[in-house]
Amino acid sequence: MTENMKECLAHTKAAVGDMVTVVKTEVCSPLRDQEYGQPCSRRLEPSSMEVEPKKLKGKRDLIVTKSFQQVDFWFCESCQEYFVDECPNHGPPVFVSDTPVPVGIPDRAALTIPQGMEVVKDAGGESDVRCINEVIPKGHIFGPYEGQISTQDKSAGFFSWLIVDKNNRYKSIDGSDETKANWMRYVVISREEREQNLLAFQHSERIYFRACRDIRPGERLRVWYSEDYMKRLHSMSQETIHRNLARGEKRLQREKAEQALENPEDLRGPTQFPVLKQGRSPYKRSFDEGDIHPQAKKKKIDLIFKDVLEASLESGNVEARQLALSTSLVIRKVPKYQDDDYGRAALTQGICRTPGEGDWKVPQRVAKELGPLEDEEEEPTSFKADSPAEASLASDPHELPTTSFCPNCIRLKKKVRELQAELDMLKSGKLPEPSLLPPQVLELPEFSDPAGKFLRMRLLLKGRVCSATRAHCVEGGPERSALSQPPARRPEECNSAEAAPSWGGSPVPQVTEAGWLEDRGREGIACANLYILLVNKICPICRRAVCCVLDLVFSLGGGAHCCLP
């Protein structure tokens, strides 16, 4: 009796007394034998394990305890049974010995080939092993695989075979060095099951190749992994994964606890937001501006741009306070329903900027009225900007703040309200009271178009402006504002040849208020008056608001839509 058998019996008596495990095997199915010619090995099935008390069976049965799972078995290809020392019917396993060659000799791996086989090297440098003159019987064992044993991460990979040691850890036998390896390194892995004739398995931390069928002369050797070898590696992989996961979770919890102890202030206190530069927002917009579904024009203005317009009007007090500061400006979020007295003060006191200068001029009276705002506590959402223009114009269109901070929003809101009132009158059929005052020209030097081409082309608005207004815009100079020039003729007179007066010549005659309202070109003038504010000088939020107002204007004239940049 061998040492392994004695050790197995000792563990049996110490662990479970007279209770022993009887191992039986199950042969391969006849269909598999017919398909591949000769049967290959089959691993022990759990259903074949039976427990019988107080008796030790004969030589056909293997006696092992349940707790003793590290016993390695040999497999008999003829009986399709596992055994420890020898098969009850066919005796001990048959080994094919290598040709003895000292370690360190060049090309040692090819010289260790057993008799009856040879290593064939192709012209491309690839090597292969084949049987030459004798049939290799089924069940013969080649090996062990020789090479340098190392951990898994140090293995070469292609010529390495994984093994599981006694401590259930991975190791590899690296056969990349031809001076230390043997001929088994040249055996090619089979590409499909029908061409395989060898099965690789592990026994006592060594790798062996077993012939699963007869190998005839001229046939090349092809090896594949045995079923028990693959299951062993798979079970070890699962255990390693679970162990690493449990270990990683414990380490993560420990690191979090240590971090919480080192930085207790992270668990409480307000969140510090990053400081903005150049008026850019670090947060992306959560919606695409072009994906808004078209709705009723009035409802669109009320629901979508109401808060924007209110915030634009109320932001005047914040801007006035910013203009009074000499250092970098701090723009704060203004409450939604705050009183707009400071916005009116900023509008009436004439906050302006010289076109050639970068400094903003604010009268002292306005700065004194805005004094109490400086004592207010700054909100955490405040951010810094270098100038009001950079706060609105330098930012990316896709990274806009939720409200507008451009200095023109107050005047834009006032104009929007006036236009909405006029449109309501047009819609209801009421006539406005004739104005006794001469028309006022809204001077907006910062909205000037030096070339005049952009404004004149945009005022056409896809043909919605009457021909008389179109003539004014094309022939007139950029210094004249469309706010002060109503159309010279009725729409039915705009098609005549002499219907286009010149802005550069004599003054354009005025029309009566009734004629103004009846003129279908009135909607074009309204669009032109409002679109002057959009010549690349206002913030994109205001531009979207004006776009909706223009849609409302066009709806009165036939359902056309506004196309703004």
Swiss-Prot record:
Its EC number is 2.1.1.-. There is a cross-link at K54, K121, K138, K166, K180 (Glycyl lysine isopeptide (Lys-Gly) (interchain with G-Cter in SUMO2)). Residues 371-399, 477-506 are annotated as: Disordered. The modification Phosphoserine is found at S29. Keywords: Cytoplasm, Isopeptide bond, Methyltransferase, Nucleus, Phosphoprotein, S-adenosyl-L-methionine, Transcription, Transcription regulation, Transferase, Ubl conjugation. GO terms for cellular component: cytosol; nucleus. The keyword Transcription applies. One of its GO terms (biological process) is negative regulation of cell growth. The keyword Protein transport does not apply. It is found in: Nucleus; Cytoplasm. GO terms for molecular function: chromatin binding; methyltransferase activity. Disruption phenotype: Mutant mice are born in expected Mendelian ratios and exhibit no apparent phenotype. Mutant embryonic fibroblasts show an increased oncogenic transformation capacity. Widely expressed, with the highest levels in spleen, lung, mesenteric lymph node and kidney. Among splenocytes, predominantly expressed by B-cells (at protein level). It comes from the Eukaryota. Residues 115-226 form the SET domain. May be involved in transcription regulation. Belongs to the class V-like SAM-binding methyltransferase superfamily. This is PR domain-containing protein 11. It comes from Mus musculus. The gene is Prdm11.
